[in-house]
């Protein structure tokens, strides 16, 4: 499975804006083999990347999206039979997995005229051995506890942690809220995401991870923070080094 595969050099409609941090390039798509499905959370440029989808569309068996987002995929050449759209709380199964589109406090749109035209979501991915949560983007709210009550606990929870500002609290969490949200859903192992690749907010590069780490220690939450491309065994995770201090 790939979730929000953003494997290009820029996360905006204009290439010279929002370039990747120089410390780590994206994993080349040609090196990613045996892709069964892609799960998408919403249609913003840093999550739904046109060049990545073009390279993936003929190598992926199926795409799972919130309501309306499939229209982008179809216009980019993805066959309609390979797209499943789900509303919040809708469930489907795929290759032994239960997939559930869940609420998130965010918004959508790739331009001035299409805001709120497609849905956004967080995702539950439940298999025989592991239960996983992906927060997507969004502000903190009671929906996290509701998701945890319905589908938790989760062996692994990937929590948005980056590209925030106090003025954007309704649509992006602060790092401390990200940890709390991970605990609200019942996450046993938390991983901060959305912080290490692009700069889309005025905070420093390491502010998200340092604050997430500090709050996790205060709340006794188990976390990992692997470098891009690192393989992780969520059943027996190795302690993650503070690799960001080397850059």
Question: What is the role of each PLM region?
Answer:
Residues 235-247:
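A short C-terminal boundary segment appended to hydrolase-like catalytic domains
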Residues 1-43, 50-55, 65-68, 109-115, ...:
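Pre-active-site segment of Zn-dependent metallo-hydrolases
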Residues 3, 64, 80-88, 155-160:
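Short hydrophobic/aromatic-enriched beta-strand-loop microsegments
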């Amino acid at each position: 499975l790939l979730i929000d595969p953003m494997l290009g050099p820029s996360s905006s409609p204009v290439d010279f804006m929002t370039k990747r941090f120089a410390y780590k390039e994206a994993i080349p798509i040609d090196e990613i083999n045996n892709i069964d499905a892609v799960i998408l959370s919403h249609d913003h440029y840093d999550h739904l990347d046109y060049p990545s989808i073009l390279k993936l569309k003929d190598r992926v068996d199926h795409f799972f999206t919130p309501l309306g987002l499939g229209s982008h995929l179809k216009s980019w050449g993805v066959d309609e039979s390979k797209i499943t759209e789900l509303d919040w709380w809708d469930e489907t199964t795929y290759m032994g997995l239960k997939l559930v589109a869940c609420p998130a406090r965010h918004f959508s749109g790739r331009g001035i005229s299409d805001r709120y035209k497609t849905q956004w979501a967080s995702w539950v991915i439940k298999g025989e051995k592991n239960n996983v949560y992906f927060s997507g983007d969004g502000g903190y709210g009671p929906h996290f506890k509701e998701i945890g009550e319905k589908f938790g606990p989760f062996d692994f929870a990937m929590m948005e942690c980056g590209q925030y500002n106090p003025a954007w609290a309704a649509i992006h969490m602060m790092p401390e809220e990200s940890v709390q949200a991970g605990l609200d859903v019942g996450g046993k192992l938390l991983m901060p995401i959305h912080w290490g690749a692009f700069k889309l907010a005025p905070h420093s590069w390491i502010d998200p991870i340092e604050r997430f780490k500090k709050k996790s220690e205060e709340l006794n939450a188990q976390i990992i923070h692997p470098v891009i491309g690192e393989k992780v065994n969520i059943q027996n995770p190795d302690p993650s080094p503070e690799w960001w201090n080397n850059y």
